Amino acid sequence: ANFEIVNNCPYTVWAAASPGGGRRLDRGQT
């Protein structure tokens, strides 16, 4: 998964790689 995510954002990449905890930074909400 390094083609469409890379085009999105930097936080979206790690968010998608996470099991569910990464969904919290879906919009960059720290």
Swiss-Prot record:
<dbReference type="GO" id="GO:0050832">
    <property type="term" value="P:defense response to fungus"/>
</dbReference>
<dbReference type="InterPro" id="IPR037176">
    <property type="entry name" value="Osmotin/thaumatin-like_sf"/>
</dbReference>
<comment type="function">
    <text>Has antifungal activity against C.comatus, F.oxysporum and P.ostreatus.</text>
</comment>
<dbReference type="InterPro" id="IPR001938">
    <property type="entry name" value="Thaumatin"/>
</dbReference>
<keyword id="KW-0964">Secreted</keyword>
<comment type="similarity">
    <text>Belongs to the thaumatin family.</text>
</comment>
<keyword id="KW-0295">Fungicide</keyword>
<dbReference type="GO" id="GO:0005576">
    <property type="term" value="C:extracellular region"/>
</dbReference>
<keyword id="KW-0929">Antimicrobial</keyword>
<dbReference type="GO" id="GO:0031640">
    <property type="term" value="P:killing of cells of another organism"/>
</dbReference>
<protein>
    <recommendedName>
        <fullName>Thaumatin-like protein</fullName>
    </recommendedName>
</protein>
